[in-house]
């Protein structure tokens, strides 16, 4: 991937309509946007979920585009849960300078921006550049009307405003990625200065809450690739072949991560597991390494590897110091948000690679299964959707004698093998 810098344009459909001043309190503020309640019966307000927050470092000017939730609180005010993210670092820098943080919430963006905004990138890497690389062309940006920021010219809706660094206020509860309601906490808020939008703007949302969800799917797509790059390229571990995260068992893919490896030594495995556990805050609470024949997107195969490749007292490690994120097991009810964020968690590392060569997978060899499939299809039976392992294959512990005797068996000449066994009789001890 080669990042491509954005290009500045003079105008765009994102600013076909401009709402400022009294308009914001006369039916053309946040109340004109049809924001749904994501978890009816539990959420305390509508929340922006497909909100791509745009800010820039007040010292370097480098942009950050991140997807963070926002509680709608008034026609001209929304909350924002971002203090633990890169945008939160911008906020703290502005707080030290005694100035508000300018921000724009961009809704309805091209896919490359949406994917870039949900990927965990280095702090000083501009997501606009990643979006350009994904799209193969520069992202067109226009200047905001009331703040000094550049936003995507083709967006559906742009909410401009300033975030106080002097005050924070209650935010939440909201249905969150672990599959549980997030508690009420204290968070910053944005005071809207302008809303621009297309003439016939379409509001887009991400249904979040219990996984798998729209938000978990878009997040884990980018996260898999970022962790793969971290392990194979940044950490220089060529044994790493692929990475999968499982939102169907762990919420948004943050907690459960599986690494496929071409194992040559156990050192490469533990290096990969420790690097994965150290990735970005609360991600990868459970890290599992498996061999190259395991389908890392099939939970059944992963459990097979854990069940028969792992000696628990040798192949399992717990590492401390993980960020808890929104993991409810890390702190009891009633703990203030600013305290819970500092509560240390831990990670479980499992080496589920085979410790030595194993006998073949106990299914018929591939050619026999393929012939069975042909017969099945000739009979017009329902379409088969085989999943690995659907045929037997060698795992290293199989002798030439084993191969020859198996060939004799399928030819019907297993009597020969019986005679060999008879010739090698011994008395029991």
Regions found by a protein language model. Name each.
Residues 1-429:
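Extended, highly charged
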